[in-house]
Amino acid sequence: MPPPRGKFSKDRKTKRNQQSLLFKRKRFCRFTVTGVKEIDYKDLDVLRDFVGENGKITPARLTGTRAFFQRQLTTAIKRARFLALLPYSDQHKV
């Protein structure tokens, strides 16, 4: 009988463990460290750091932002988009 392929293969688990060991780093909330109370939609330099190249909001699991600040961040980005301070997609140039 040939070895299992696809999602039941054992090679996938070992490969995933090797990758996670290479890129493991401690994530921290930028807003907690700097002592920010509220995230402002007019602070475009900060907001651009949390928007990807394609215009999507970067998730908290990648940035390490706490849930409290992630909610504020998404509303601030959406407000900035509505006021045309930030683009909705990567097709628009700033």
From Swiss-Prot:
One of its GO terms (cellular component) is cytosolic small ribosomal subunit. The keyword Ribosomal protein applies. GO terms for biological process: translation. Pfam families: Ribosomal_S18. GO terms for molecular function: small ribosomal subunit rRNA binding; structural constituent of ribosome. Part of the 30S ribosomal subunit. Forms a tight heterodimer with protein bS6. Belongs to the bacterial ribosomal protein bS18 family. NCBIfam families: S18. Binds as a heterodimer with protein bS6 to the central domain of the 16S rRNA, where it helps stabilize the platform of the 30S subunit. This is Small ribosomal subunit protein bS18.
